[in-house]
């Protein structure tokens, strides 16, 4: 078995680490407005959760965050730090509520601290300095730095990024609705089947066509800020 970081199974192992729910960045504490959708009665059943999560995946993640992640992977790999900084600013500006912005800033900060402490990342020449030089790195910016440094193929990295988001949303629904564990697995199986096509489309979507226009999500997130009883931070 190859132990070369540029080939063999090691990039896959690193990818599994990045996509793991055990990654200590606090993702499990956020629902991205889903908790308010449950509170107001929009999401009450497994079918409701499938529709809500699927819509956010299709209309926000796939049309904005996914192509931005693809562009970030290329910019990191090409050494284009100016492009990385521009995309970071674009992503921060795209967060429509204080909770959504605080979420990506906190998770980005936590991941930067983690990577700086991992020899597997910090020991690679130049990568730590490039990452810590960024002002307020958003989570996808820090995440793609690790993926690029570990030479994970772009399509695999993007698939794992979307899967990790999807898994977190489904687990939030399981807790908040609540749903059973089997229902959660059905949601992952059904919604996960769309990921390959979304990844392929995201990699060739022109920047002029990027869009995260999801007013329902923005309203849910803003209403969650004053929700009386909450399990989640967003």
UniProtKB/Swiss-Prot annotation:
Any Gene Ontology CC annotation: cytoplasm
Keywords, alphabetical: Chaperone, Cytoplasm, Nickel insertion
Lineage, broadest ranks: Bacteria, Pseudomonadati, Pseudomonadota, Betaproteobacteria, Rhodocyclales
Xref: HAMAP family: UreF
Pfam families according to UniProt: UreF
Family: Belongs to the UreF family.
Name of the protein in its database record: Urease accessory protein UreF
Subcellular location as annotated: Cytoplasm
Keyword Chaperone: yes
PANTHER family assigned: UREASE ACCESSORY PROTEIN F
Subunit and interaction comment: UreD, UreF and UreG form a complex that acts as a GTP-hydrolysis-dependent molecular chaperone, activating the urease apoprotein by helping to assemble the nickel containing metallocenter of UreC. The UreE protein probably delivers the nickel.
Species the sequence originates in: Azoarcus sp. (strain BH72)
Function, in words: Required for maturation of urease via the functional incorporation of the urease nickel metallocenter.
Superkingdom assignment: Bacteria
